[in-house]
């Protein structure tokens, strides 16, 4: 095999591409990883890492390098800051791993993944490389990319292409795969920062859903005293105005108290729910945000992409080594798509619960959650977190 031929090309080197790079290296598969950006994104985005994804990466033996914080629980509070329902992580299935959900600081998370991926001799990692063209002929994929500094172009070949290039996926667009909106768009103001000491409101838990219909807000204590506020963008707001510190501090000072804080980012984001019409075409596969997008209310966007990688790569490894027939790869979409759809629906539903802006609906919500918490306690309030079935799998594909 020449230097321009690979078993797998990975387009995109965010968390999903990083997961692919580590798994490909672990399996000893010759891989090329491309990303337009030279470095990791310096600001936090994803903040949760669940047990399934921790377990999937455990054989790569670098998890201790990822800085994490155990999540003790979430408190849902009404407009008067009285607890509606408190959820602790006790009782939730950990899938035979140490913790059900951990907080992460994504820039450090990315760096740990990338540093480990470098150790595999079968990985060729080219950041600062922009994918320009893709086509597949007789099962061989041809990719053209350029160096973003010199504009020098290169053509490479592979047996498989994994599109981990995000919501605006170049690979998806080049292959004409339609992205269907699920009509769940919402705008939220995100404020990230650091504090020298923990906020008083986090004495027993690590996240608060402030279900105030006047301005729903999520407050999170992350890794090493990082914090995040997600503040609902309301009618009458303007992006320019709400990002001013004197404005957004009106909504968060009551939680910060006397703590000294430093803000690292303020931005208004539109949260989307969408799904690609199909997740593969020939030997080209879409993973992560390239295939599906969901609101962040369950912290499952990045985790769903990492599950995609784990599901697909052991099958590709088996096909390349002659252990399984190629048709096993059809089970990637048939297994993952229904699973992601269910989690997306749950995230949309949870968002609608948190984001009730009508006072009457908020009152009904508060009453229902209090009753549910009283009857069920902490167990299975959100059954989506306690095990999820895949769609039709290998037995269907191998018939």
Enumerate the language-model features and the residues they cover.
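Active-site-adjacent segment of FAD-dependent monooxygenases/related oxidoreductases
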Residues: 43-116
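Conserved hydrophobic helix-helix packing surfaces used for dimerization/oligomerization
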Residues: 8-10, 31, 284
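A conserved short coil-to-beta-strand element within the FAD-binding core of flavoproteins
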Residues: 127-141
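Glycine-rich FAD pyrophosphate-binding loop
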Residues: 25-45
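Conserved FAD-binding catalytic core of PHBH/FMO-like flavoproteins
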Residues: 140, 160-271
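Helical substrate-recognition/capping region of FAD-dependent monooxygenase/halogenase enzymes
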Residues: 2-11, 26-27, 36, 80-81, ...
